[in-house]
Design a protein with these regions (language model features):
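A conserved structural/catalytic subdomain of Rossmann-like adenosyl-cofactor enzymes
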Residues: 1-172
Length: 172
């Protein structure tokens, strides 16, 4: 519901595939896949649409499309991480000037240290690209993607914890 601006009732979209090769019907429940714009409106992002579309590809057995999508997500994610890392130093300097307690300064320092570990992840990503760029075996490449994601998990968990800690210190 609230997906279409002129319709107040829930809606269902049906897509018919004339080149369908089997008798199976794919139904995707996308009720919880959206970005809330305001109280009354929801919107699909480009990533939401890609994720829903890839489900159809997986249903048809085209796993290589899924692996390619994950590669694009990794590339875009690394690009955003590098962009954000460049912004960390100026913002942390401003925070250190404003914060007058030791706890806040320590929290900022821990976040800066966490961002410094991004260099190892960039190296790991470059190794992944070099080793698996031309990989044709879908299972092997997908396994490598899972391992790469696992390498990033501690970075994001620590970053999340650090931001929560900084937020808590600033609010006190």
């Amino acid at each position: 519901s609230n997906m279409f601006y002129t319709v107040t009732l829930p809606a269902t979209l049906w897509f018919f595939d004339k080149a369908k090769t089997d008798d199976k019907i794919l139904f995707i429940d996308a009720r919880n896949i959206f970005t809330q714009i305001d109280r009354a409106h929801r919107e699909f992002s480009e990533e939401h649409i890609q994720n829903i579309a890839i489900i159809s590809q997986l249903h048809k057995g085209r796993r290589e499309k899924f692996v390619q999508l994950i590669d694009r997500y990794f590339a875009a994610g690394m690009e955003r991480l590098v962009e954000n890392k460049a912004r960390v130093e100026p913002v942390s300097s401003q925070l250190l000037e404003v914060l007058d307690d030791a706890g806040g300064k320590q929290a900022v320092g821990e976040l800066v240290q966490q961002w410094a570990t991004l260099a190892k992840l960039k190296t790991r990503y470059a190794q992944y690209q070099g080793k698996h760029a031309d990989e044709t075996a879908v299972d092997k490449k997908n396994k490598a993607q899972q391992q790469l994601r696992e390498a990033f998990d501690p970075f994001f968990a620590a970053l999340h914890d650090g931001l929560k800690h900084l937020d808590k210190v600033v609010r006190q």
